[in-house]
């Protein structure tokens, strides 16, 4: 068995946009569009900051998260399927 932790693409994606402070557009299942920077997330929710205000958004209400700039999650030098990112810390705090 490999000693590396298995990482899911959702955590890798959210951690990447959080660490890089990439602006995102979050579309909710009811059609509402939210924009801001993800400052924290866990298994059930995301904190989204914009203009000094923070919103707690529950993941079950999210349809799509679209980054405001192109991102690269996968390291082309690593084997296919290796996300190559550390997701141990999910907060900027």
Curated annotation (Swiss-Prot):
Q: Which GO terms describe its biological process?
A: regulation of DNA-templated transcription; regulation of RNA stability; regulation of translation, ncRNA-mediated
The Sm domain covers 11-71
- List the PROSITE patterns hit by this protein, alphabetically: SM
Q: RNA-binding: is it a keyword of this entry?
A: yes
- Looking at the Swiss-Prot or TrEMBL record, what is one Pfam family this protein matches? Hfq
Keyword vocabulary terms for this entry: RNA-binding, Stress response
Domain of life, per lineage: Bacteria
Q: Name one GO molecular function term.
A: RNA binding
GO cellular component, as recorded: cytosol
Per its UniProt record, what SUPFAM superfamilies does this chain match?
Answer: Sm-like ribonucleoproteins (SSF50182)
InterPro entries, per database record: Hfq (IPR005001), LSM_dom_sf (IPR010920), Sm (IPR047575)
The intrachain disulfides are none
Family membership: Belongs to the Hfq family.
Q: How does it assemble?
A: Homohexamer.
Q: Which NCBIfam families match?
A: Hfq (TIGR02383), PRK00395.1 (NF001602)
Classification via HAMAP family:
Hfq (MF_00436)
What is known about what this protein does?
A: RNA chaperone that binds small regulatory RNA (sRNAs) and mRNAs to facilitate mRNA translational regulation in response to envelope stress, environmental stress and changes in metabolite concentrations. Also binds with high specificity to tRNAs.
**What is the protein name for this chain?**
RNA-binding protein Hfq
The gene that this protein is the product of is: hfq
């Amino acid at each position: 068995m490999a000693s590396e932790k298995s990482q899911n693409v959702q955590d890798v994606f959210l951690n990447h946009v959080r660490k890089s402070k990439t602006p995102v557009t979050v579309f909710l299942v009811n059609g509402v569009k939210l924009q801001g920077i993800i400052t924290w997330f866990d298994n059930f929710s995301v904190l989204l900051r914009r203009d000094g205000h923070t919103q707690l958004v529950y993941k079950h209400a999210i349809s799509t998260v679209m980054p405001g700039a192109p991102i690269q999650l996968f390291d082309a030098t690593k084997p296919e399927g290796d996300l190559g990112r550390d997701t141990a810390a999910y907060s900027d705090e």
